[in-house]
């Protein structure tokens, strides 16, 4: 009936973190996802380039900071939305691994282009032409991020099927919690790399405070 609830008995066997990791590592498709997630972690550093552009450039030069946040944030969201709508159908017809590699490149190159674009027009990024160019760049980056998210979920679902085929059980919870583990691990690695990079160039400690104080006092990248 409508008010009847199906009760599924919980599994008697419980696994700790060590056992769960062994299950994940022993599954070849998921192991490949784990390794690729670690290898992709430096891409997250490129996100800081975008945030630097928004916070230090548009946030300090122009009074319409929220307008630019809406424009570029909308570009990222739009790119993600379109990619997430298209990728499931494309994944049915094309090799998922190649699509994952392509999406990684698609997400990395646009963010990497932000600094060269700044060098081309350091004083004119508020002009319609450059705003349009950056809109396209952010949209492509958002598309790459959205495609990666969908493909990772699809490929982890395939890993669950693989485990069921070879071991006779479906560790859905283990593998999809592993997806969160991959994301957190990648973020941690990228943060370490980013911190080391900032230390090498001297952008840490008192220098960060000095930079922020200078910006608050009216300094701008246009004067460089």
Q: What kind of feature is each model-predicted range?
A:
Residues 1-224:
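Membrane-embedded alpha-helical bundles of multi-pass transporters/translocases
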